[in-house]
Amino acid sequence: MKAVKKYFITGGAGFIGAHRVNTILDSTDAQVTVYDNFSTGRRWAYGDRISDSRLSIIEADVRDLPRLTEAMKGHDTVYHFAANSDIASAAKQPDVDFWNGTYLTHNVLEAMRINGVKRIFFTSGSGVYGEIGEEPVPEDYEHMVPISTYGASKLASETLISAYCHMFDMKGTVCRFANVVGPHQTHGVAYDFINRLAKQPEKLVIYGDGRQSKPYIDVFDILSAFDLLERDQRESYNYFNVGSDDHITVTEIADIIVEKMGLKNVVYDYTGGARGWKADVPIYRLDTKKIRATGWANRMNSRQAVEASVEAMLDDLKNGRYK
């Protein structure tokens, strides 16, 4: 009889984490333990699955290594989503991405080592590359110079995972995502715009000049990448860019939201400058040939992903889920 797979998901109540929990419960007979401090997480994101006997929820902090280690016992696969989600906050709190980023990854890896857990998936991002401009950047780019503490923390976490995988016979998969959007977002440009316009529908403050352009990816497209990458990995450590091959500007996102909210004559108040916030990378493109060679493909382009996510967030707003 085949053993039931047991997943341990840090940050499993957050935006991407909750969707991963839901897809695992919906498509497998596996058991899932969510380990989350619920600083931004939401139980309602699980829907009816909240009562599924295969789902266990532990409200605790990944910084608590003894408790984390005890909770992880008996699991075989870790998804590590727990991290600081407010990239701009580091300008006022410079250590946030260490304590809520790199340090968390260290603790997860230590808990895995102590418990003999051998498989980890980690969500990284384009911030590891730094300023790369409009040329699509491949995974083996030689000049990775992050300009934000968020990007530095993600890169440090990647190298820690690589080291633990090689030293302690683990297998690690890192996904460097484009900007992820979808239902139940807890942060991001579109999320911020919707909340600002709900409070002040006649004017929208837009950080920067609105010409920042980036690739966006629907959350369900990245979940399909996880499903594919779970099936087989011979290397101790591997990493992939996962995103759309096109892009969309901040002003275009604002236009989509204004239209879908049915607003008229909204004044855009640009704060000026190329960056939306300190250490923002205003333009980047990802080379996604490596992940596409596995057979993965995104269903939605950047614009479609943003449009779908805006519709879902407006539905959440209508139903009182966002305050």
List the model feature ranges, each with a label.
Residues 156, 160, 164, 193, ...:
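Hydrophobic alpha-helix immediately C-terminal to the catalytic Tyr-X-X-X-Lys motif of short-chain
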Residues 60, 199-323:
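C-terminal substrate-binding subdomain of Rossmann-fold SDR/epimerase-dehydratase oxidoreductases
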Residues 50, 82, 112, 197-201, ...:
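Hydrophobic aliphatic residues
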Residues 70-71, 111, 196, 225, ...:
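CheY-like receiver
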Residues 66-69, 88, 95, 106, ...:
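Residues in well-ordered alpha-helical elements
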Residues 135-136, 187-196:
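A glycine/serine/threonine-rich, flexible loop-to-helix segment
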Residues 19, 44-45, 70, 92, ...:
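Generic recognition of short, well-ordered alpha-helical segments
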Residues 1-180:
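N-terminal Rossmann-like NAD(P)+-binding domain of SDR-like oxidoreductases, especially those catalyzing
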